[in-house]
Amino acid sequence: MPRHARAFSDTTRRTSDTAAALGLSPTPDPALADLDLGGWTGRDLMDLPVGQVAAWIADPSATPHGGESVLDLLERVGGWLHRVAALPGRTVAITHPAVVRAVVVVALDANPESFWRIDVPPLTSTGLHAHGGRWALRHACLPL
């Protein structure tokens, strides 16, 4: 992790535990919460209606689960990126794979449909650099 970086995370135990293992004391930020899966939260993927899952993956605006759409997540994460780009120094976010996917899509100004084509394993680091209001991807999915 970058030295002397400010750290942010959501308030879940898994991000708190990861931050503690990294020696970080993050500031809670709801913008870094995982994608809200609504009625699908905690359910096994194989138990979900196949047609609804397929529609959800194909359409970033879909919310068959009653939670948050991928477009909603991209907007939320985009707002967070805009805020931290204005801060001096380095920032570390301890967050969830879906949020990291959203960060990459927003930073690269990629098509929202590319969200599901980004694989983010747990306990990895993705690095970006902001300059002049634009983001550049430095590295992705390096093991911690």
Region spans (language model):
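Generic beta-sheet signal
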Residues: 5, 87-98
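Short beta-strand scaffold positions
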Residues: 9-10, 75, 94-95
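Acidic, low-complexity terminal tails and accessory targeting/binding regions
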Residues: 35-46, 105-144
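Generic structural signal for well-ordered alpha-helical scaffold segments
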Residues: 74, 78-85, 104
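Short glycine/proline- and acidic residue-enriched helix-loop micro-motifs
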Residues: 52-72
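A short, N-terminal amphipathic alpha-helix
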Residues: 1-5, 82-83, 130
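Amphipathic, non-transmembrane alpha-helical scaffold segments
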Residues: 12, 70, 74-78, 117
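Phosphate-coordination/substrate-recognition cap region in phosphate-metabolizing enzymes
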Residues: 1-53
